[in-house]
Amino acid sequence: YESVFIPVGTKHRIANKTDKNVVVIEVGIGDNISDTDLVKIYNKDNPQASANYVRLDKSPIAKLEPAFKDNLWGGTKIRDVYGKKCDYDVIGESWELSAHPDGQSRIAEGRYKGMLFNEYLNIIGKEALGWKCQAQDRFPILIKFIDAKQALSIQIHPDDEYALENENEYGKNEMWYVVDSEPGSYLYCGLSRDASKEEILERINNNTITDILNKIEVKAGDVVMVKAGTIH
């Protein structure tokens, strides 16, 4: 798969010189859709011939209200710095895009205001989610803000195979983007060295597991990929 960024005002076209189908997904940013917002499909043998057009969906963008979590390790930045409206004294997480039953986003405005995100997805249908979601029976993405004022628990998330077999859930890869950080902030991701099962169990029991984890100092703008099965 390839992606191309096309700045405003740049002439461009899509051409296919092969006998195989090419799938192109065009994403535009703007308030309105006009006749210029079209994907034009050229005939490979005669580029000047009349072309087919595929018009973008004119449905409005659905703005969401987050679901909040009052985790004990949380702080107040999600409300005080980022302006999220929540009455919790401490906010650990703000689930901005979520169809997970443990905390669903809600439609923020318009005809479906107040509706749970999962209910809204049932109305608009799978086709509106893009071709990569067609084979899945639930919305697969969760986007959240985390305010970690204190250390979180050490965790390992399963992959799809294990999670579907044992929990009827999808596995969980994570991508962390550090929006802001205090001096000396760090994350744990993966083991710093090889360790036996017996050593890991012993360190879990005596609360020294972080001694063999990979400690990563972070600053605003850093990105960390945490694949399923990685201790963090």
Give short role names for the model-derived ranges:
Residues 15-53, 189-212:
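Double-stranded beta-helix
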Residues 170, 210, 222-226:
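Short, glycine/acidic-rich beta->alpha junctions
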Residues 36, 43-195:
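Transition-metal
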Residues 30-32, 159-161, 181-184, 193-196, ...:
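Short acidic/polar capping segments at secondary-structure boundaries
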